[in-house]
Amino acid sequence: MAKETEMEFEGTVVEVLPNAQFKVKLENGVVINAHVSGKIRMHYIRILPGDKVTIVISPYDMTRGRITYRKIGK
């Protein structure tokens, strides 16, 4: 059985939580929990409330996601 593909969404960081976790409001209005990807962590990219980000969500758990990109300029 093939692995399901991940879905990509745009959103805005609403709240910063401990352990590099964030609450992100997607463009469709849904708020999910997200953590940063390894490359963002490795390059010490800061994510603050109000930042526009790209999120990857697995079809198996639609309540959690991974931040893969922070948009430059709000």
From Swiss-Prot:
A GO molecular function assigned to this protein is: translation initiation factor activity
Localization of this protein: Cytoplasm
Which PANTHER family does UniProt cross-reference here?
TRANSLATION INITIATION FACTOR IF-1, CHLOROPLASTIC
Its quaternary structure?
A: Component of the 30S ribosomal translation pre-initiation complex which assembles on the 30S ribosome in the order IF-2 and IF-3, IF-1 and N-formylmethionyl-tRNA(fMet); mRNA recruitment can occur at any time during PIC assembly.
SMART domains associated with the record: S1
The name this protein carries in UniProt is Translation initiation factor IF-1
Q: Which InterPro entries match?
A: NA-bd_OB-fold, RNA-binding_domain_S1_IF1, S1_domain, TIF_IF1
Per the UniProt record, the source organism is: Mycoplasma capricolum subsp. capricolum (strain California kid / ATCC 27343 / NCTC 10154)
Q: Which family does it belong to?
A: Belongs to the IF-1 family.
Which UniProt keyword terms apply here? Cytoplasm, Initiation factor, Protein biosynthesis, RNA-binding, rRNA-binding
Q: Where are the transmembrane segments?
A: none
* Gene Ontology, cellular component aspect: cytosol
Domain S1-like, first and last residues per copy: 1-72
Q: What gene makes this protein? A: infA
Q: What's its job?
A: One of the essential components for the initiation of protein synthesis. Stabilizes the binding of IF-2 and IF-3 on the 30S subunit to which N-formylmethionyl-tRNA(fMet) subsequently binds. Helps modulate mRNA selection, yielding the 30S pre-initiation complex (PIC). Upon addition of the 50S ribosomal subunit IF-1, IF-2 and IF-3 are released leaving the mature 70S translation initiation complex.
